[in-house]
Amino acid sequence: MNKAQFIKLLEQEGYPQPIEVKQVPNGSLGDHTHPFAVMALVTEGSIDLTIEGQTKAYEPGDVFQLRFEELHAESYGPDGVTYLASRK
């Protein structure tokens, strides 16, 4: 998915305009939650998300979503990760 398609998807799903988020190479965040739902488009690098014991990798062009208060862990690839994220 490209940025224009992602912006359109956000609008359809009732999300506000996204912000750019950058995470460091080989970084990680252990299990945590957010008090909001997230929809994000990976634009550079890679991120692995672990939810309910299942890990999935996301690379440029991939979209990931997290539900409100969904417990998850994050790990970032050797080039870190940059993504556009919107929350509601």
Where are these regions (language model features)?
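Short acidic-glycine-tyrosine-enriched beta hairpin
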Residues: 52-69
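Ligand-binding loop in jelly-roll beta-barrel domains
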Residues: 68-88
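Conserved short histidine dyad/triad with adjacent acidic residue
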Residues: 16-34, 67-69
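Fe(II)/2-oxoglutarate oxygenase catalytic core
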Residues: 1-2
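A generic "binding-loop/recognition-motif" signal
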Residues: 25, 35, 54, 70-71, ...
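N-terminal acidic leader/helix
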Residues: 8-15
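Short, surface-exposed secondary-structure edge patches
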Residues: 30, 39, 54-57
